[in-house]
Swiss-Prot record:
Its EC number is 3.1.1.4. GO terms for cellular component: extracellular region. Binds 1 Ca(2+) ion. It catalyses: a 1,2-diacyl-sn-glycero-3-phosphocholine + H2O = a 1-acyl-sn-glycero-3-phosphocholine + a fatty acid + H(+). The keyword Membrane does not apply. GO terms for biological process: lipid catabolic process. It is found in: Secreted. Its cofactor is Ca(2+). This is Phospholipase A2. Expressed by the venom gland. GO terms for molecular function: phospholipase A2 activity; toxin activity. It comes from the Eukaryota.
């Protein structure tokens, strides 16, 4: 589930940018 957590952060990171 670590990948899922990182995936969520990555998606939010792009949205914030």
């Amino acid at each position: 589930n670590l990948i899922q957590f990182a995936n969520m952060i990555g998606c939010a990171n792009h949205g914030s940018r």
